[in-house]
Structure formats: structure tokens, C-alpha cells
């Protein structure tokens, strides 16, 4: 199975997925930037606002998180499901969603000086906690193809206790 990310105008790989979290029961679309420098998948302020996440009541990450822009304070959203589109089959024409349950998902709440970004610039980060299940990557025709092999499928089953 392949996770397919489209490369944008500056060759950043983006994936259109779905996200669901309590108390909401419905899935919401979300754009992820493939970020190998991020150890964890993380929601950024524009998605926190768009999804209507009540971040004030969420637990705060106690350790200091340092980003390229300096230290930040993250909150934790619990019991999240991220669904990512994959393709498979000999002709790579069979489409499916791979469901990735996350017991907690860090999010960066909007600050007091928050100003929304233009929609084409809005994304959250798909980190190595998810990307590690796709060990073989190739670039082809403006896309990043990430292969999800059988060994990784078994590893995913064991780590998620499926």
C-alpha cells in the first residue's frame, strides 16, 4: 500500500486526510505537511480554530517544546483517529483509508496575537510517529510515494494492539 503526498509549488509534500476526536463523532478534512523533523503529528493553530477544538480545557504538555520559532506550549487532544488515503493493487488503483488511532495528539493553540493564514497555507504536521510505518519513499511525477510494507503492517498491528 502506498501513502501518496502531492508536492506543492515549493516541493513540500502534503496529504489530504481526515481527523476525528471526542466529543465530535464526524470526520473533518485536514491537510498534513509531511514533516520528518517532527517526532509527533501535531495540529497547528489554524486547524485548531477551524475544527473548533476547545483547547482551554485540554491538558498542557509539561516539558518545554522548542521549535524553529522558539519554545511553545502544547496541549493534548486525547483519543484521536487520523485516516489517511492509501492506494494499492498491481495497478495502484484500489483506494482505501488507513486508520491510525492516536491516544494523544499534541496541538498548538492559537496565541493572543493569532491571525488566520490564507487557506492554501494552512496545514498541520504529520510526524514520525505516523511516518515510521512508511519506510520506503520515492518521488514520482510531482508526488511523494510512501510504501507501507507487510512488515510495517504487522508492526502497526502490534503497536496498536489490533
Residue spans of the language-model regions?
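Pepsin/retropepsin-fold aspartyl endopeptidases
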Residues: 1-162
Amino acid at each position: 500500500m502506498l501513502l501518496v503526498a502531492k508536492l506543492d509549488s515549493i516541493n513540500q509534500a502534503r496529504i489530504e486526510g481526515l481527523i476525528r476526536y471526542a466529543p465530535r463523532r464526524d470526520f473533518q478534512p485536514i491537510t498534513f505537511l509531511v514533516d520528518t523533523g517532527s517526532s509527533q503529528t501535531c495540529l497547528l493553530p489554524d486547524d485548531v480554530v477551524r475544527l473548533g477544538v476547545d483547547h482551554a480545557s485540554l491538558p498542557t504538555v509539561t516539558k518545554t517544546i522548542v521549535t524553529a520559532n522558539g519554545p511553545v506550549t502544547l496541549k493534548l487532544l486525547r483519543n484521536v483517529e487520523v485516516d489517511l488515503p492509501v492506494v494499492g493493487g498491481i495497478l495502484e488503483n484500489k483506494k482505501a483509508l488507513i486508520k491510525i488511532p492516536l491516544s494523544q495528539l499534541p496541538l498548538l493553540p492559537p496565541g493572543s496575537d493569532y491571525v488566520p493564514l490564507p487557506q492554501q497555507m494552512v496545514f498541520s504536521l504529520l510526524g514520525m510517529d505516523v511516518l515510521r510505518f512508511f519506510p520506503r519513499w520515492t518521488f514520482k511525477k510531482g508526488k511523494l510515494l510512501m510504501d507501507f510494507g507487510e512488515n510495517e503492517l504487522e508492526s502497526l498491528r502490534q503497536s496498536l494492539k489490533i
